[in-house]
Regions:
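Class I SAM-dependent methyltransferase SAM/SAH-binding core
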Residues: 55, 64-111
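A short glycine-rich, Lys/Arg-flanked "PGG" loop and its adjoining helix->strand segment in the class I
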Residues: 136-148
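N-terminal, positively charged/glycine-rich alpha-helical extensions of SAM-dependent methyltransferases
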Residues: 1-23
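Short alpha-helix
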Residues: 197-213
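Conserved alpha-helix/loop element of class I SAM-dependent methyltransferases that forms part
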Residues: 32-50
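A short acidic, Gly/Pro-enriched loop at the edge of an enzyme's catalytic core
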Residues: 113-121
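Conserved class I S-adenosyl-L-methionine
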Residues: 51-60, 153-179
Length: 235
């Protein structure tokens, strides 16, 4: 695993440098990352339906899909979607041992969505990078593509319920990144690079999107200040 020494110039991109350091970047930048990822994987396995498709919207390097497939095996099929060519290349290599069970597909979710029905959909730190005006349509598509009883596992960076809470969450989040070895300069460079690219919304707004799409049950399964994860079940 390459160490994250990425120094972004201009707007943030999921380029080859980011792809190489991505696992280290997540482990050091996402609070309780291992806990969140394990919970997401466990829920995907728990709710997977026999002989259905599992779709990862924003699969990055494909690691989580491979973890799920290592348990479910050929009882299911696996589709990873991303828009970054370096990420797609890494995901194809990661998922190659699955052979025909897995596909990695280049799609821009702003204008193109997978037509296949599925049993489980993952969206892990993906919607936050998509302009807000497209998000409800994407969540609606995921709901409509799920089989009855199927689930969406949604993980997002979020805003606090008010400005004071957001400011407190961000301050403590940056303190965590310092503890994980990032410098103040690296934190500031990444913050500026992500402005207007990563656009979080409140937890309540995310939950409203899930309910408005028609999900019968929605619950939060993980939260750390300005990060949250939900399981949404189709009725």
């Amino acid at each position: 695993m390459a160490t994250d020494r990425v120094q972004p110039q201009g707007a943030w991109k999921f380029d080859a440098d980011v792809t190489r350091a991505f696992d280290d970047m997540l482990a050091r930048s996402i609070p309780q990352y291992d806990v969140m990822r394990r919970a997401t994987t466990d829920l995907a396995i728990r709710f997977a339906q026999y002989r259905t498709l599992i779709v990862d919207y924003g699969c990055s390097r494909g690691v989580q899909l491979l973890e799920i497939a290592s348990v479910l095996g050929d009882d299911n099929r696996y589709l990873g979607i991303d828009v970054s060519e370096p990420m797609l290349e890494a995901a194809r290599a990661e998922l190659a041992p699955l052979g025909a069970l897995a596909e990695v597909r280049a799609l821009d979710l702003r204008c193109d969505l997978p037509p296949e029905p599925c049993g489980v959909a993952l969206s892990v730190l993906t919607l936050q990078f998509i302009p807000i005006e497209h998000r409800q349509r994407i969540v609606q598509h995921i709901h409509d593509s799920l089989a009855p009883g199927g689930v969406l596992l949604l993980v997002e960076k979020v805003l606090g319920a008010n400005h004071a809470l957001s400011a407190a969450f961000v301050e403590l989040y940056y303190a965590m990144k310092l503890e994980h070895g990032y410098t103040n300069d690296a934190i500031e460079r990444k913050r500026l690079s992500l402005e207007g690219v990563l656009v979080p919304i409140t937890a309540a707004w995310n939950e409203d999107m899930l309910h408005d799409a028609g999900f019968a049950s929605v619950d939060c399964y993980w939260r750390w200040m300005n990060f949250a994860a939900w399981v949404a079940i189709k009725g």
